[in-house]
From Swiss-Prot:
The keyword Signal applies. It comes from the Eukaryota. Residues 48-73 are annotated as: Disordered. This is Larval cuticle protein LCP-30. Residues 172-239 form the Chitin-binding type R&R domain. Major cuticle protein of the integuments. May interact with both chitin and epidermal cells to form stable cuticular structures. One of its GO terms (molecular function) is structural constituent of chitin-based larval cuticle. Residues 1-16 form the signal peptide. The keyword Zinc-finger does not apply.
Length: 239
């Protein structure tokens, strides 16, 4: 790249040297000794309007020293924008102050950096195979327990409930029924319709029932049921 720039600079200087070279006036049958640049109205110009590079240097590069770097002009501090640093620490300009410590020296144990604690290595655990064990279920054999039977304490009392007598009669004006069982339960009831066709029409019932208790005693209850409700009467019923 530097060689290319040197060649370009040499060509530029050569062209500039040719432009400023002195050319003596040559004889011309038209102009003879008269300068073509002298203004003379009416004089014939051989080739008017054609560009003549010998008349000026328009468009040609002319090298000069404008813009060249000037290392030291002796005016530092006079013009604005120059760096005005200080050679001492704390002065204006923020001068760089190096360290006197030798960083290349090995400090050994005196230097204590951040300690890295290695993580514990966890070894994989191999699962222990477990063999299933069959446990037979315990069979419980049922035990028969006989129910406790309490014999009756009364004489002539038993639990037979078969019907040994039955009577039933139903009529438009009333009804009547009677039944007796093997365990000596006896019941009879009769009902009659009274005040037929009036506002006080209703049925009047009268009956009784009796049975032999566990103590061998016969208990009887007589009752009526009418417009006054159900009324029972017996020797063992409190008055």
């Amino acid at each position: 790249m530097r060689v290319f720039l040197a060649i370009c600079l040499s060509l530029t200087v050569a062209l500039a040297a040719e432009t400023g070279k002195y050319t003596p006036f040559q004889y011309n049958r038209v102009y003879s000794t008269v300068s073509p640049f002298v203004y003379k109205p009416g004089r014939y110009v051989a080739d008017p309007g054609r560009y003549d590079p010998s008349r000026d240097n328009s468009g040609r590069y002319i090298p000069d020293n404008s813009g060249a770097y000037n290392g030291d002009r002796g005016d530092r501090g006079a013009a604005g924008g120059f760096y005005t640093g200080s050679g001492t620490a704390g002065g204006p300009g923020g001068a760089y102050v190096g360290t006197k410590e030798d960083l290349s020296k090995y400090l050994g144990d005196a230097y204590k950096g951040s300690s890295i604690v290695p993580l514990p290595v966890v070894k994989p655990t191999i699962p222990v195979p477990v063999t299933p064990t069959y446990v037979a279920s315990k069979v419980v054999t049922p035990t028969y327990v006989a129910s406790k039977v309490v014999p009756p304490s009364g004489a002539g009392y038993d639990y037979k409930y078969g019907i040994i007598r039955y009577d039933n009669d139903v009529a438009p004006e009333g009804y009547h029924y009677l039944y007796e069982t093997e365990n000596k339960i006896l019941a009879e009831e009769a009902g009659k319709v009274e005040n037929i066709g009036t506002e006080n029409e209703g049925i009047k019932v009268k009956g009784f029932y009796e049975y032999v208790g566990p103590d061998g005693v016969t208990y009887r209850v007589d009752y009526t049921a009418d417009e006054n409700g159900f009324v029972a009467d017996g020797a063992h019923i409190p008055k």
